Amino acid sequence: MKNYSSLIIGGKKFSSRLMVGTGKYKSSQDMVESLSNSETEIITVAVRRIKNEQSGENLLEKINWEKYWMLPNTAGCVNSDEAVRIAILGRELAKLSGQEENNFVKLEVIPDKKYLLPDPIETLKAAEILIKKGFAVLPYINADPILAKRLEEIGCATVMPLGSPIGSGQGLLNLSNIRIIIENAKVPVIIDAGIGVPSEASQAMEIGADGVLINSAIAQAANPPLMAQAINYSVKAGRQAFLAGRIKKQDFAVASSPEKNISI
């Protein structure tokens, strides 16, 4: 049974339901301000891109790791063997940052360079190996209810179906499948990829997602810190709306004023 009062992943409790990525920012200052404005507690770090090749900056030195929980990801991996190797490196990075107990990994296995769609077979294979190695696995997948359930059954800490392709800003294109995943899951469902604006983040939360992970929508906005703040508000509003319960849709109008006992 899901816990609706707080977000619990791998036995760790979080108050924020917004996860934020650290890539694509125009400057490290934009990134730091955006992270602060988002009020996130979990930030993703691409292990293979920890050092900015253009500026030479190291993410580990720019972020206060006492404030944020590191979620190393295996971006750039094209098969399960690569993903396992990078995940192990990511766990060591977390330890170097002072998070000795951090065994989280965002599992990405993406051989498709054009559409950046995850490989379901290699993802499942890597997840099985990593779980045996003691990782809390957060797998990035297509909106496939059967795969999501299988990953849950083998012990993944969450499932992370995409809303639409990475960085596309197309929003939630497969709502029916995402709804099925949410309905059937006993682990947190985090919508990852494709969200472009706050209203889409709110929509994900309104249908019952446990959280969202957002990078491009913030990092590539004209004003990233302001967008981070807007998305933070939208995630909170969407969650409250889900808990409050929306009205039933009708095929006809329903008067809001009483039709009986009218005094005038």
Curated annotation (Swiss-Prot):
CDD domains: ThiG
Binding site residues for 1-deoxy-D-xylulose 5-phosphate: G167, A193, G194, N215, S216
Single annotated GO MF: thiazole synthase activity
EC number: 2.8.1.10
One Pfam family named in its UniProt record: ThiG
Predominant location category: cytoplasm
Keyword Transferase: yes
Domain of life according to the entry: Bacteria
Enzyme class: transferase
InterPro entries linked: Aldolase_TIM, Thiazole_synthase_ThiG, ThiG
Cellular component GO terms, alphabetical: cytoplasm
Active site: K106
Subcellular location: Cytoplasm
GO biological process: thiamine diphosphate biosynthetic process
Reactions catalysed: [ThiS sulfur-carrier protein]-C-terminal-Gly-aminoethanethioate + 2-iminoacetate + 1-deoxy-D-xylulose 5-phosphate = [ThiS sulfur-carrier protein]-C-terminal Gly-Gly + 2-[(2R,5Z)-2-carboxy-4-methylthiazol-5(2H)-ylidene]ethyl phosphate + 2 H2O + H(+)
Pathway: Cofactor biosynthesis; thiamine diphosphate biosynthesis
Keywords: Cytoplasm, Schiff base, Thiamine biosynthesis, Transferase
Described purpose of this protein according to its UniProt entry: Catalyzes the rearrangement of 1-deoxy-D-xylulose 5-phosphate (DXP) to produce the thiazole phosphate moiety of thiamine. Sulfur is provided by the thiocarboxylate moiety of the carrier protein ThiS. In vitro, sulfur can be provided by H(2)S.
Subunit organization: Homotetramer. Forms heterodimers with either ThiH or ThiS.
Family: Belongs to the ThiG family.
Stated name of the protein: Thiazole synthase
Gene: thiG
